[in-house]
Structures are given as C-alpha cells and as structure tokens.
Amino acid sequence: MSDLESSSSSSSDEEELERCREAALPAWGLEQRPRGPEKPGVDATNAKLPANQPSLMHKVDEHEQDGNELQTTPEFRAHVAKKLGALLDSSITISEIVKEPRKSEVQQGALEDDGFRLFFTSIPGGPEKEAAPQPCRKRLPSSSSSDDGDEELRRCREAAVSASDILQESAIHGHVSVEKKKKRKLKKKAKKEDSADVAATATSKAEVGRQEKESAQLNGDQAPPGTKKKKRKKKTKKASEASLSPPTKSAAAVPSN
C-alpha cells in the first residue's frame, strides 16, 4: 500500500508540474510537445495506479535543456521572482481583527455553574436553592360550645340587614330628593317673577317718560306750574325793591336846592 501511495503522489506532482510548464510556454518560437491522451481528473485519495503501468508524464531530468526550456538565466529568474513577490505583497493584505466576546457568550460563561434561565426574571440557581412552599393550613372546625355559638349568632345579627331598614333608608333618600326638586322649582319661579317685575317697572318708566314728552309737545312753550310760581316771586321782589328806592333819591336831591 505504501508503494501505491508514493507512486500516486509522485504521478500527481508530475502532472501538475507538466501543466504549469505548458502554461508558461509562449505561443511563438517553440513548438509544443505532443501530449498523450488526457485522463479524467481523479482525486488523490482515490487515485490507485497499478504498479506495472508506467507513467506517461515527462520527467524533468530527461529533458534536453535540463528543465530550462525558456533558456533563462538565474539572474533573470531571480528578477522575475522579486517582481512577482512585490506584486503579491502589494495585492495581499492581512487584517488582524481581534474578536471581542459577545455579551451572550459572557453571560453564558458566567452562568455555566448556575445552569440556565428560562425567563429573564428567573433566579439563577438550582431547584435546591428555592424555598419549599409552605403547606396550607387547614381551618380548624368550630367548637360546639355555647359561647362560640352565641358569638357567631351576634355577628350574624350585626351583619344582617332587614328589609324594613332598606325600605326606610330608600324612603328617606326619596323624600330628600323630592324636597330638593321642590326647592329648585321655587327658586326658578322666584327668578322668573323677579325678572317679570323688573321688566314691568322698566316699561312703566318708559311709558311715564313718553307721556311727559307728549304733554310737553302739546303745551308748546308753556312753562310748567312750578316755573310760573318762581317767576311770580321774582316779579314781586323786583316791585318791592323799586318801591323802596325813590324816597332815597328825593332825600338826596333836597339839599342840592
């Protein structure tokens, strides 16, 4: 088996080297060597060549030019290798990215010892850490003594409400509501009466003023009786003053003669 594997690996290497050389040959100047019938590609693991069948690939040592078909010098090959290396270095970039641990991974690492959480509000820890539920206490049966019976009866009487109490309370509330309605109606009626009285007084005042204007227009320039009395008083006062003034003038004129 080792001989078969070594022969298969050497044949695959030779095939690959031959293909590279054929690809490197230019299309002019040199004639390509005749090639044998191509075999379908076989995987290296499944390639099992028999020991008695020789390989059809040309060996490098058997070439006439000792593997140097292009007749190149070592300096030229070094120069080409240097250029290719510079080209590859310029086109290839190596990025060093430090991957930060995710939050989920951190939480998972922190909770490895405590298990996992089913919900967000779950408390970490096993079931042994949870407090055991307290057992429900059963209600003790009531004693049949007379004191307990009397006390229970008293509580029932306090909690019980008779139908008469309910009717009485509803009647009181109903009476209060009726009285409130009556008071509201009386207030509304009083407001209406006050507004009617105000309107009546306003109309009466307007009617009196209108009548006075009409009477003044009918009488024309005649003055009212009050103004006549004032004029009479002024006339009598002037007459009394005129009657008192002549004797003083005559008394003053006598010494001049």
Curated annotation (Swiss-Prot):
Renumbered ranges of motif Nucleolar localization signal (NLS): 228-236
Phosphoserine found at: 55
Compositional bias per record (Basic residues), positions renumbered to this chain: 180-190, 227-237
InterPro entries per record: CUSTOS
Biased composition (Basic and acidic residues): 32-41
Record's keyword terms, sorted: Developmental protein, Nucleus, Phosphoprotein, Wnt signaling pathway
Residues with the Phosphothreonine modification: 73
Localization terms from the record: Nucleus envelope
Disordered: annotated segments: 1-72, 120-157, 170-257
Biased composition (Low complexity): 1-11
Record's GO cellular component terms: nuclear envelope
Pfam families xrefs: CUSTOS (PF23999)
UniProt similarity note: Belongs to the CUSTOS family.
Role played: Plays a role in the regulation of Wnt signaling pathway during early development.
Classification via PANTHER family: CHROMOSOME 12 ORF 43 HOMOLOG, PROTEIN CUSTOS
Protein name: Protein CUSTOS
Source species taxonomy: Eukaryota, Metazoa, Chordata, Craniata, Vertebrata
